[in-house]
Amino acid sequence: MARSVYKKVLAFKNRHPGTIAWRLEKHSAIIEKHLHPGEEVIYAFAAQKNDNPFNIITTAVVALTNRRLLIASKRVVFGYFLSSITPDMFNDLKISSGIIWGNVYIDTIKEFVTLSNISKSALTEIETQISSYMMEEKKKYRLREEIKED
């Protein structure tokens, strides 16, 4: 399982070389560190975690697992940032495409995440992976809630 996130991110970067991202192995290691037992990475990609197209030093790795969406960024000197978005906290996903790059906006109950400087060719792939997973998981949550009410 070690380095599986890095391999998926590297494959993404090879498919979509226009995406601006640095230090992918370090960021991927943070996600590997926080995976729960039995948790598997379904899809992973890299982007800048900001809304400024000129800020290209805030790379983050985003991993969709069979339980949640993880966003990790390793600091240069020490420490890191990790966000975990479970399907019950997920509200909406918005994609915008510019001349060169595109953005992915993830709206949750508690925060609004902006991922930028993503190759335009990757936007449909990212939207399909995240949306289809979250829709299926939300159905499961609703079903569990209905069973609890009965």
Predicted regions and their residues:
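Acidic, Ser/Thr- and proline-rich intrinsically disordered linker/docking segments
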Residues: 1-17, 21-24, 28-36, 54-57, ...
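Short glycine-rich, polar/acidic loop-and-turn segments at beta strand-coil junctions
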Residues: 28, 45-49, 68, 75
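The phosphoinositide-binding surface of pleckstrin homology
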Residues: 37-54
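Polybasic phosphoinositide-binding surfaces of eukaryotic membrane-targeting domains
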Residues: 57-71
